[in-house]
Amino acid sequence: MSRFFTTGSDSESESSLSGEELVTKPVGGNYGKQPLLLSEDEEDTKRVVRSAKDKRFEELTNLIRTIRNAMKIRDVTKCLEEFELLGKAYGKAKSIVDKEGVPRFYIRILADLEDYLNELWEDKEGKKKMNKNNAKALSTLRQKIRKYNRDFESHITSYKQNPEQSADEDAEKNEEDSEGSSDEDEDEDGVSAATFLKKKSEAPSGESRKFLKKMDDEDEDSEDSEDDEDWDTGSTSSDSDSEEEEGKQTALASRFLKKAPTTDEDKKAAEKKREDKAKKKHDRKSKRLDEEEEDNEGGEWERVRGGVPLVKEKPKMFAKGTEITHAVVIKKLNEILQARGKKGTDRAAQIELLQLLVQIAAENNLGEGVIVKIKFNIIASLYDYNPNLATYMKPEMWGKCLDCINELMDILFANPNIFVGENILEESENLHNADQPLRVRGCILTLVERMDEEFTKIMQNTDPHSQEYVEHLKDEAQVCAIIERVQRYLEEKGTTEEVCRIYLLRILHTYYKFDYKAHQRQLTPPEGSSKSEQDQAENEGEDSAVLMERLCKYIYAKDRTDRIRTCAILCHIYHHALHSRWYQARDLMLMSHLQDNIQHADPPVQILYNRTMVQLGICAFRQGLTKDAHNALLDIQSSGRAKELLGQGLLLRSLQERNQEQEKVERRRQVPFHLHINLELLECVYLVSAMLLEIPYMAAHESDARRRMISKQFHHQLRVGERQPLLGPPESMREHVVAASKAMKMGDWKTCHSFIINEKMNGKVWDLFPEADKVRTMLVRKIQEESLRTYLFTYSSVYDSISMETLSDMFELDLPTVHSIISKMIINEELMASLDQPTQTVVMHRTEPTAQQNLALQLAEKLGSLVENNERVFDHKQGTYGGYFRDQKDGYRKNEGYMRRGGYRQQQSQTAY
């Protein structure tokens, strides 16, 4: 008989505690017979029948809960995996959603996830700290969620307009379902614990009812006991369940399931509790409605922090009635400085105290010496405001710093009797005795050098494409003005070493700037300019070239440190190259011998050297010296790390090779954006120079199997272009150069010219040069000349003779130029021909082998090498080296082998005998 038709009593299902576990005591008669009476299906555990809606929604809520946990720990990879599973689960529940509508918790997770991803995307610092997998998952998930949310746009919009209402509706629904349950906490997915437990407790099992019977009072009504008996007889018995499951069920039932009110007092208390909850709910709704009405009627509201703002009183520096003297002020200054650098010190308050101390000293006429000393400490405190080296100064602090340095310089220029220096000890300071020169410990040069470093950090940490960068760049005029003032001060009172240091600062702010006014004066002859223009030019001061010459020569003569002299030489060369003074720049580079030992310099100097070499190569290209330009740019471009070597950014592949600290150090060495060299212009100059050198060389050595490559990068671009199955019109700069190279191979200079010089290339490259028209004219002439050389190399075997006038017309070159080019080729033995002066023709000598002969020669050479390799392998297998014994045995190629192996064979024969 099935267990569903058996009746059991309370004694049959009583449980007893064994150790710490709650175990059901089985009946003796049924225990042994149960495996024989029950079928396989009846031995299965009890199943809870749920609807399809509950199953699908539970699957969705579990996935949502996992996503929210991943969001809390910023695990974007886990979010991506669970979001894909969530989409699949939602697809399975589509039929239910079409009937019931989209669940509110699903809309909430979509909106929250999209906002969360947008916050992560905008957090630049956080993105940098992400690992590779999370960063990739963030980009992928952001695209997927934006695409996925388009189908739920209306639901998400309504949710975002009133998210609180959606949450309240869910809360009300859960409160009604729970009917006064003590646990009102709603989880993140809108399903409360009370609702969950109520569903479970609507049809309790027999064991749980029995357990609750024992916990209830014994004075229950007879109807309740009869109902319990009916439940006992009518419910399914759990005798076949494991002891562990029974223990868990009884424990959960006793902990979570509610008890029915047994007395009138309990019923009244429950009723009162429900009334209180309904009243609280009504109060919340009315309060929210009142607030909304006030918001609509009262206009705009202003958000304040912590109520009425209090007027901040100035801190009291001295007690009332204290006499302000030099000693008192210096003592107070030392007290303030003692807290400097300590943990918990308010740096902003410390700066305010020092500024207040300056005002007190000025009001009491304590002298300029005390004010200068306090000013030095204010500037030092401004620099120490950010303890982290990588953090740049805030705009307000930066403005205070510039103003304070200017005020300090005003005082020093107005009072020549004040001497400042690092070598002055605090014991020997003279701050108030006017009979002697005032002496203050401090170094104005160190403050200015730190100011320059802070300016560089500000420019490094500002978005170069924003208006903020332009505003910060305007501050460079103030920085340069301060450097000039300090330069004038140190020229009068500073040492030679200090003058060299301030000169270098001035050079570093001058060398990269193109002097347009001096350039215009060079283009305009002095006779054509009026007298007023000449007077204006004289009043403007010296040109940047004259200034650089004066400052650098002083450093060359007076400096005792290699670093300052090296930086000055490199800046001087850069400035010469920038203004197209090629020969001065080249001679200075060769005489300095910097290329021999630059690898021992520190990284910032190496970056400056790389920038100088690049500018030198661009200068040579503007002058039409393509070979010099190619040689100067070869090291930078062949490495494939031009961006990193020039200090203009870090490569992604190199970021994996260094840790976070090394990356921070590398970023601090980067050059600000306004000092950058255009990398596309640099690559274009290099590739065009390589094209003008490589294409004629390839045509001249076409049959040479061992020809060397002048530029590996140029050959790589040619191979990439040849691999493309379909060739459309060129778009990028590299494609333009490759297409021009193919045209030059055929001697078609016009097509080559159209690919190199056009509107697209003008906008990207050629218009960026100061003298763009001059550069374009030079390029056209170079293309014509090298195309002529390529044509003669390629088709010399076709002609017996060719007229120079014909060549002049083909390449649109004047006759003397054609004559000069051909003469150089004949003299250098590049072209086997002779010039017939009366007829102005080039007579070919035909000493070069034809194409068929070249192929035959190559085949013969390869066959010869193959025979030698086979003989060597055979000798190695036979154990004889040099083939002597084999040749003696059967005379196989005896003479030829002897002649070919020569001395080695003879030496072996001597040792054998």
Curated annotation (Swiss-Prot):
Cellular component aspect of the GO annotation: cytosol; eukaryotic 43S preinitiation complex; eukaryotic 48S preinitiation complex; eukaryotic translation initiation factor 3 complex
Keyword Lyase: no
Provenance organism: Homo sapiens (Human)
Entry's transmembrane regions: none
Primary gene name: EIF3C
Domain spans labelled PCI: 673-849
Biased composition (Low complexity): 8-21
Disulphides: none
Phosphothreonine carried by residues: T524
GO molecular function terms listed in the Swiss-Prot or TrEMBL record: ribosome binding; RNA binding; translation initiation factor activity; translation initiation factor binding
Gene3D superfamilies assigned: Winged helix-like DNA-binding domain superfamily/Winged helix DNA-binding domain (1.10.10.10)
PROSITE patterns: PCI
Protein name: Eukaryotic translation initiation factor 3 subunit C
Keywords: Acetylation, Cytoplasm, Initiation factor, Phosphoprotein, Protein biosynthesis
Biased composition (Basic and acidic residues): 199-216, 261-278, 886-899
Modified how: Phosphorylated. Phosphorylation is enhanced upon serum stimulation.
Entry superkingdom: Eukaryota
Residues where N6-acetyllysine is found: K99, K643
